[in-house]
Amino acid sequence: LIKQPVVGTTHVEMPRNEVLEQHLTSHGAQIAGGGAAGDYFKSPTSARTLIPLTASCLRPDGVFQLGGGSRSSFNPLQTDFAFHALPSRPRHGGIGSRQFVEEFVPAVYLNPYSGPPDSYPDQFIRHYNVYSNSVSGYS
């Protein structure tokens, strides 16, 4: 049995852009998560390490990438078109864990339940439409 040293968590404070966040939220975009914000480090002995970011790490047009190491394949014009092509109607269910489950449906769950669509959990419906809160093929 080999013991490895415990590596502490590194926290990075990201600069906030309220205008961009409001634009993304209004158009239904959400970065995974959605938990309540708060300071979880209550112990006076726990050290909080912050890494300053340079201005060049985040592009001023709001295009960013999570994970990976390659450059973004979108230019600002394509990104703007993508945002404006999204429906303007609000999504059903709000933003949070329910919307996350609705948008990232596991492909292995096709239709494991039988019965009318109202009896299915939303995350298991193959043709569930989050905009109209309906299932295609059912009236």
From Swiss-Prot:
Q: Which residues form the propeptide?
A: 35-69
Family to which the UniProt record says this protein belongs: Belongs to the adenoviridae hexon-linking protein family.
Entry annotated with the keyword Transferase: no
Under InterPro entries, the record lists: Adeno_PVIII
Keyword terms, alphabetized:
Capsid protein, Host nucleus, Late protein, Virion
For this entry, the protein name equals Pre-hexon-linking protein VIII
Q: How does it assemble?
A: Interacts with the peripentonal hexons as well as the hexons in the facets. Part of a complex composed of the core-capsid bridging protein, the endosome lysis protein VI and the hexon-linking protein VIII; these interactions bridge the virus core to the capsid.
GO CC annotation terms, alphabetical: host cell nucleus; viral capsid
Q: What induces it?
A: Expressed in the late phase of the viral replicative cycle.
Give the domain of life: Viruses
Name of one Pfam family that matches: Adeno_PVIII
What further fact does the record state?
All late proteins expressed from the major late promoter are produced by alternative splicing and alternative polyadenylation of the same gene giving rise to non-overlapping ORFs. A leader sequence is present in the N-terminus of all these mRNAs and is recognized by the viral shutoff protein to provide expression although conventional translation via ribosome scanning from the cap has been shut off in the host cell.
| UniProt-annotated site: Cleavage, residues | G34, G35
Q: PTM comment for this protein?
A: Cleaved by the viral protease during virion maturation. May cause the middle segment to be shed from the capsid.
Single GO molecular-function term? hexon binding
